[in-house]
Every structure is written in C-alpha cells, then in structure tokens.
Amino acid sequence: MPHLTARVPEAQLAGNEPALITALTEAVVEVYGEWARDLVVVHLDGVPGGRWGIGGKTVDDAAPAITFGIREAALTRPGGNETAARLVAAVTDAVASVLGEQARGGTSVELVATPEGRSGVGGVIA
C-alpha cells in the first residue's frame, strides 16, 4: 500500500495513461514523502462507453472515481484526519491536472482503510 484504482471513462483516459499514473504517484509522494514512491501502485480501469451509469442512465462524461487502499493506522493515528484531507485534495488535483479542470468537481476519492493483518502479498499476510 498505497494502492490506487482509478476508474475513468475510456474516452477521457485514452492517451493520458502515463501522465495520470505519474500524477497520482506524485500526489501520494507529496503527502507521504519520497520514501513512499516505490510503494505506490496505480491501476487504471478504462470504462468503455455505455458502461457507466448515473441516475439509471448511461453517461460517457462521468468524472473519475478513485479508490485508495491505505493502512488503517495512517488514518487513526494523531493527524489522521489531516492526512486523509491532504490525500483527497492531492489526488483530486492530480486528476484535474491530467484530465482537465472539468473533472475536478465530480472526481470521487474513497479512502479504504485496511486493518493490520487483513491484507497480503504473495500468499502472506502483510
């Protein structure tokens, strides 16, 4: 961790993949520091046209939805609320810097806190 999954309409994502990966990584480094750079994992999921729905209707211009997997301890220690606010702001700024300001207002960032001992890598609890 941190692991970020960005779901973005394919029409917005196409051609912007490297820049978005870089910007999201830099957003995490901005908040945590340089030590976190090699730990940042970004998955980009391009959603094809007709496969994103809002209010029961398909849309092709939805704003990105970011899921940010983070250790629970990062949010429960002193200053955790400030860390959460900084992460949400930095990730939103990163999206807007690559996909344009029109994406900012609707971009959602969900911080998913994982308790210690509740995730693993390579078959081992991490």
Regions found by a protein language model. Name each.
Residues 1-126:
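A domain-level signal for the structural core that forms small-molecule/cofactor-binding pockets
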